[in-house]
Amino acid sequence: MVTSVACGGGNTIKKAVPGPTATVRSARAAHLTLSSTAFSDGAPIPKQYTCDGANQSPPLSWSAAPTGSASLSLVVEDPDVPGGGFVHWTVSGIAPSVIALQAGHAPPGATEGRNGAGSVGYTGPCPPAGQTHHYLFMLKAVAGSTVLAVGELTGTYQRPGP
């Protein structure tokens, strides 16, 4: 199923559709510490990482994945978009030995998925003018379909109002 949602600038875009596989979170999932040198948890995301700037993914780093992790996956989503949110970036197949992403890059060997705009790769925050939206960066360490650890980082962005 594909639904259409409005996202900034009056453009209509398609919302990403989740894949057919699901993951199960372990009852004892560990915590990954996910952070960025560009912004703190709960703070505004700098303009260069948005549609109003260079539209590149921010630098991210995290604590080591737990033993037994087969890979890491990252999803960036705006839950404030009406109709169920908007996916800005998905990256899967990140090697468990990787502990950081440089700005504007996915790690070698990882797979970037389609975002809510229908393109592959990152698309930066772009809420309607005058509205503040929240952007949830969620990193999961997985083994098969089991989630071993989760880390979250939230940023905000507001475009100037009319």
Residue locations for each model-derived region?
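N-terminus-centered regions that define maturation/targeting leaders and the start
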Residues: 3-162
